[in-house]
């Protein structure tokens, strides 16, 4: 029998969050399954959707001063939160941080803007270079943080500079060469910075050709990815010299399930919520996949999904 989740709410912290962001922005014991694309996860003690960069800065300062754990989310597309929830502050930089501005060959966007929306804005402006991101179901902030990529393109190819909030409360603009982009990695991720916005550099292109390329990639996704189920996208990073999905398939794990978490039969690189999955199901499924692939092929698969909380 599952134990009841222990929720730790301190009224003085709630009051201080109210003062900073307003009562409408603060929720307590908020189920994180409502804020992740895998649709799993227990309650966050405090869930805050700030309205301004200054509110973010003040909330981070409060958390640092009071030694409260904090974590920033966008639309939760690459995140699995523990069934026990998160004993700290979740900062939702999503709905209140959307905005896209095209200036010549450059696009300036806020962190909560969806990559799909930015790609569409680029197409409408006749700008090419972002077609690869037209189906990535995440925000600009998350995409920059992890150097998201697909179909041969990565965010590092187009990012010119990024506005961040450091953990000590300083708002800085980092140029491309300062971002330390690697495969699903960046300085932003390593140092725990908060992405506030970014400037992207694209190139002029033919609108019809851009649209055709985006449609081609969409058709590939529909054909090969389990878009009809909740998931966290690609489950594993690509091991050098291999494809993660093929290793999982060759290990005989297509359709393999733990509870409601299942290896997609459509694409073995994806784990899906086939119904009623828990975060523990997802974690156990990943562990079993890792063990099986390691045993059969000597390759250690590393999760691309980020896990938050206690497992």
Give each language-model segment a name.
Residues 1-7:
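N-terminal amphipathic/basic-hydrophobic helices that include classical n-h-c signal peptides
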Residues 8, 12, 33, 51-54, ...:
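Conserved active-site and cofactor/substrate-binding residues in soluble primary-metabolism enzymes
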Residues 9-140:
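Anion-binding (especially nucleotide phosphate/pyrophosphate-binding) glycine-rich loop
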Residues 66, 73-75, 158, 229-230, ...:
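Short, basic and Ser/Thr-rich N-terminal targeting/leader segments
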């Amino acid at each position: 029998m599952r134990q009841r989740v222990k929720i730790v709410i301190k009224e003085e912290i709630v009051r201080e969050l109210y003062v900073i962001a307003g009562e409408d922005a603060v929720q307590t014991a908020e189920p994180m399954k409502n804020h992740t694309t895998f649709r799993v996860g227990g309650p966050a003690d405090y869930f805050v959707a700030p309205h301004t960069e200054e509110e973010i800065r003040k909330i981070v300062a409060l958390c640092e001063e009071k030694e409260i754990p904090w974590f920033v989310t966008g639309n939760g597309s690459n995140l699995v939160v523990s069934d026990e929830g998160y004993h700290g502050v979740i900062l939702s930089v999503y709905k209140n941080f959307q905005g896209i501005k095209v200036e010549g060959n450059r696009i300036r966007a806020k962190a909560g803007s969806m990559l799909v929306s930015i790609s569409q804005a680029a197409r409408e402006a006749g700008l090419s270079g972002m077609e690869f991101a037209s189906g990535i179901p995440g925000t600009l902030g998350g995409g920059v943080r992890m150097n998201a990529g697909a179909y041969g393109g990565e965010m590092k190819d187009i990012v010119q500079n990024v506005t961040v909030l450091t953990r000590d409360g300083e708002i800085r603009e980092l140029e491309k060469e300062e971002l330390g982009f690697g495969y699903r990695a960046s300085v932003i991720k390593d140092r725990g910075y908060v992405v506030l916005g970014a400037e992207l550099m694209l190139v002029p292109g033919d609108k019809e050709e851009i649209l055709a390329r985006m449609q081609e990639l969409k058709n590939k996704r529909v054909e090969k990815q389990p878009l009809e189920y909740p998931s966290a996208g690609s489950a594993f990073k690509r091991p050098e010299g291999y494809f993660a999905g093929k290793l999982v398939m060759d290990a005989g794990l297509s359709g393999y399930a733990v509870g409601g978490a299942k290896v997609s039969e459509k694409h073995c690189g994806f784990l899906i919520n086939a119904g009623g999955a828990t975060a523990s199901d997802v974690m156990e499924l990943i562990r079993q996949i890792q063990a099986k692939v390691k045993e059969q092929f000597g390759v250690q698969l590393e999760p691309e999904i980020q896990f938050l909380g206690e497992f």
